[in-house]
Structures are given as structure tokens and as C-alpha cells.
């Protein structure tokens, strides 16, 4: 396996598991990050899907292993084994679906049952493009994250809003990144994804 430019150093791998209720946008967030695309036709994830992405950070290269889990009840028994050796849990809810938000506490409890405090947890409120149907305010999301001592961000997989920032913030919190965070207090790490450079012109939607 290639070290992707980190000659003499094995490429560090970090496992990110995406959790949340059905149709909150877990697969769409991964697809936006991996391919910068969005598919309007919804297809439920069956069981567990796995994708891998190399990220070139300021001072090193890491490989993110993205595990996309099914939200349906019938697949719940599979999920703990995937949480068990994860570095990061990304718990996603739909800002237009109150139940999906309420269930985030249960998902985070599941993560802590399997991993204790030895895990980074990011709470993500997805579908900000549907602001007119919003049921959970950003303040409520921030408050929930504060109560549960986890990170928080809102995103739109459809427009791409904050998706890169989500992964930047996760990357800045990875084990061994403390020295980079010191140099980069705002977590604004220069991340080059392993795909051709995008033209500097329009990027479609907000590129925050």
C-alpha cells in the first residue's frame, strides 16, 4: 500500500463511522466529500458501506476510512462492532426532522458504551438547504452538543455547505494533530483532497 508521499512513514489510518436515523443524509455527506456530487434519488444504505480517502494535511498525510451505516432498525445489531475500533463517530440528524435529532443522544450513548471517552464525536445537523422546513434551531444543536460534550456543525450535503469544514474540523481533532492545532487555532488546516484541482470559479452552493 502506497504511503502517498509520506516516504519512510506508514500512512496513518483513522476510522470514521457515520451514525444516525434513516434518511438524515449520512451517505450524501460522504458522497459530497468523496466526489463533490449529490444524488437526488434516495436509496437506503443496506448494512454497512466502506469508502477510503487520503487527505494531505499541513505536515502529514492520513487515510480516512469512512464507514457508512444503515439507519434502519433491522441493521442496528451490526453497528456496535463497527463503532468498537473507530477513531471518530459522526452522528448526523436532519434539521427538518425532530425525531432524528432526539435520537442523537441514543446514538452518542451507543458510541460511548463501545468506546468510552477514547473517541472523537461530531454532531452534524444536515439539510440546511431546507431552512424553511427547519424544526431544530442551530442554537438547539449547539446546546445539545455542549450538554453531551461533543463537537457540532451544520451542513448541507446538497449544496456542499460546510462539508469540507466538517472534515477539516474532524482532521484537526485526530490523535497527533495537537501541534498542528497550536499553529492553526481556528482549525483552518490546508487540506488537499486526492482528486484534480477544482477550477477557482464557481463551486455550486456555499463553499464555506
Curated annotation (Swiss-Prot):
Record note on what altering residue 72 to L does: Interacts with APBA1. Abolishes localization of VPS13B to the Golgi
Required cofactor(s): Mg(2+)
Domain description: Switch 1, switch 2 and the interswitch regions are characteristic of Rab GTPases and mediate the interactions with Rab downstream effectors. The switch regions undergo conformational changes upon nucleotide binding which drives interaction with specific sets of effector proteins, with most effectors only binding to GTP-bound Rab.
InterPro entries named in the record: P-loop_NTPase, Rab, Small_GTP-bd, Small_GTPase
Renumbered ranges of motif Switch 1: 39-49
Annotated family: Belongs to the small GTPase superfamily. Rab family.
Keywords from the UniProt entry: Cytoplasmic vesicle, ER-Golgi transport, Golgi apparatus, GTP-binding, Hydrolase, Lipoprotein, Magnesium, Membrane, Metal-binding, Methylation, Nucleotide-binding, Phosphoprotein, Prenylation, Protein transport, Transport
SUPFAM superfamilies listed in its UniProt record: P-loop containing nucleoside triphosphate hydrolases
Residue ranges of the motif Switch 2: 71-87
NCBIfam families reported for this sequence: small_GTP
Protein name: Ras-related protein Rab-6B
Binding site for GTP: 23-28, 39-40, 42, 45, 71, 126-127, 129, 156-158
Pfam families in the record: Ras
Single GO biological process annotation from the record: protein localization to Golgi membrane
Activity modulation comment: Regulated by guanine nucleotide exchange factors (GEFs) which promote the exchange of bound GDP for free GTP, GTPase activating proteins (GAPs) which increase the GTP hydrolysis activity, and GDP dissociation inhibitors which inhibit the dissociation of the nucleotide from the GTPase.
Organism: Homo sapiens
GO cellular component, one term: Golgi apparatus
Enzyme class: hydrolase
Tissue: Predominantly expressed in brain.
Described purpose of this protein according to its UniProt entry: The small GTPases Rab are key regulators of intracellular membrane trafficking, from the formation of transport vesicles to their fusion with membranes. Rabs cycle between active GTP-bound and inactive GDP-bound states. In their active state, drive transport of vesicular carriers from donor organelles to acceptor organelles to regulate the membrane traffic that maintains organelle identity and morphology. Recruits VPS13B to the Golgi membrane. Regulates the compacted morphology of the Golgi. Seems to have a role in retrograde membrane traffic at the level of the Golgi complex.
Protein localization: Golgi apparatus membrane; Endoplasmic reticulum-Golgi intermediate compartment; Cytoplasmic vesicle
Gene encoding the protein: RAB6B
Subunit organization: Interacts (GTP-bound) with BICD1 (via C-terminus); the interaction is direct. Interacts (GDP-bound) with DYNLRB1. Interacts (GTP-bound) with APBA1/MINT1 isoform 2, also called Mint1_826, but not with isoform 1. Interacts (GTP-bound) with VPS13B isoform 2.
